[in-house]
UniProtKB/Swiss-Prot annotation:
This is Cholesterol 7-desaturase nvd 2. It comes from Ciona intestinalis. PROSITE patterns: RIESKE (PS51296). The keyword Kinase does not apply. Its EC number is 1.14.19.21. The gene is nvd-Ci-2.
């Protein structure tokens, strides 16, 4: 409001002085009092600063795009109800079908490494669990179940890192080892009960991101999450974040759904699937995509699969195709949640690090971090990746509004999709949590907590 007020004063000062001179009510030497001139100059300075700030963000600042659940991926045809009501109805009416377990086993991104400093405690919520993520005094990342087994206070809400590597509950000061999760101190007790502990989650940090290992049966990680081989030769260009209402398997399964690429992703611009054909540009310029998905070839790395995409962007006039741009994407899926996407264009090389993490059943957090050749201007990189983001948001519309069935109707040309489903089954186990027919989350083999 203050900035808007100053801008109005600026316009008023300029127009009023000139108007009085033109009307002959004062001569060319006329000026408003000094105080008004000071306000005018301050307003001009603020406007210039705002313009320069906007220009800097567009030209030089990395992309930082965050979409909430309600921002993208829903249709709103019935305007007699609000958009929020429409989204709730879509979620409520979604048929669950015979779905796989809701949380696969593997590594999942939970934060950027820079988000949590040495000695800090952060509250995070993933896999339907409240967790305490903290960095100990030596800089090592730790994660524990957030609820103290004493009186179930949330240790991530006011808890502190103490004794180099312990999390202290803010309620009564009970201290738990970040390395083991065991209770190590009760400040007012003569003897510490040795059988008390909280669940400790395995952590790692790769490419500037913090990951947790999820497994329904606990235990140590089954594989090491690798760093991207090209990231150290590229520069950071930004990131996007989307919250999605779907089963987690829908998202990586997209890689093996080859037939959708040349249909859903054929138009070059726009994330609104219902309006992409209204654009003149989309009726002239098209993607022509060839792709293949392959299961793992290395028996020592069954958790990895690959995909290759060749994308010819062409201008079509009277059915004559004129090539405009050729793109290649080499995609490495690592477990159920991490993907390295290597981008080749005629002008630069790029990298997208995609991560999908379950927040709770049928709610996923999808992030993309972007990197490009060092000499590429950030504004060019942002434009390229924003176009890629519009393609992702078309998929989100499909994911948010579809359901999942174990045995869909497939034609023989979709054999890769069936192979992908068989490959992905390795990330579920007998005790993986599931949704029952009433929509309740069930943990097989895990006793229910008794009401107190």
């Amino acid at each position: 409001m203050l900035i808007e007020y100053l801008i109005r004063i600026t316009v008023m000062v300029i127009t009023s002085e000139r108007l009085l001179i033109l009307m002959g009510l004062c001569d060319e030497s006329f000026h408003f009092p000094v105080m008004i001139r000071v306000v005018f100059n301050a307003a001009v300075a603020i406007v210039i600063a705002l313009v320069m700030s906007k220009l800097y963000k567009v030209l030089f600042a990395p992309l930082d795009l965050r979409r909430k659940l309600e921002d993208v991926g829903y249709v709103h045809h019935d305007h007699s109800v609000s958009r929020e009501e429409n989204i709730r109805d879509t979620q409520r009416r979604k048929k669950l079908g015979n779905t796989p377990p809701v949380f696969p086993n593997g590594w999942f991104k939970v934060a950027d490494s820079t988000w949590i400093k040495k000695g800090q405690v952060k509250s995070i919520y993933f896999f339907g669990e409240q967790l305490a993520l903290f960095r100990n005094k030596r800089g090592l990342l730790r994660a524990l179940d957030a609820y103290c087994p004493h009186l179930l206070a949330n240790m991530a809400a006011g808890g502190k890192v103490v004794n180099s590597d312990c999390l202290e509950c803010p309620f009564h000061g009970w201290k738990f080892s970040g390395e083991t999760g065991k209770l190590v101190d009760v400040p007012y007790a003569q003897k510490v009960p040795t059988f008390v502990s909280v669940k400790k989650w395995s952590c790692c940090e790769v490419d500037g991101m913090a990951y947790l290992w999820y497994h329904c049966d606990g235990g140590e990680p089954k594989w090491v999450l690798p760093s991207s081989v090209t990231i150290n030769t590229l520069k950071y260009a930004g990131k996007t974040e989307h919250i999605i209402n779907s089963h987690i398997q829908d998202i990586p399964e997209n890689a093996a759904d080859i037939s959708h690429l040349d249909h859903l992703h054929k138009p070059v611009i726009g994330s609104d699937v219902e309006k992409t054909n209204e654009s003149l540009l989309n009726n002239l310029i098209f993607h022509s995509i060839q792709a293949s998905w392959k299961p793992p070839t290395d028996p020592n790395e069954p958790h990895r699969s690959t995909m290759s995409i060749k994308d010819n962007i062409h201008l079509s006039i009277f059915n004559i195709k004129i090539p405009l741009l050729y793109l290649e994407f080499e995609i490495d899926q690592i477990g159920p949640g991490a993907v390295h996407i290597h981008v080749r264009t005629p002008f630069f090389r790029g990298l997208m690090l995609q991560n999908v993490t379950p927040i709770e059943p049928f709610v996923q957090k999808l992030t993309h971090s972007f990197y490009v050749s060092p000499w590429v201007p950030v504004c060019i990189a942002k434009a390229f990746y924003l176009l890629e983001t519009t393609q992702i948001e078309r998929d989100i519309l499909m994911w948010n509004n579809k359901t999942y069935f174990r045995q869909p109707v497939l034609v023989k040309e979709e054999s890769a999709l069936a192979k992908h489903r068989r490959w992905y089954q390795q990330f579920y186990s007998e005790n993986s949590p599931r949704m029952n027919h009433r929509g309740d989350l069930v943990y097989p083999g895990k006793p229910k907590l008794a009401d107190w």
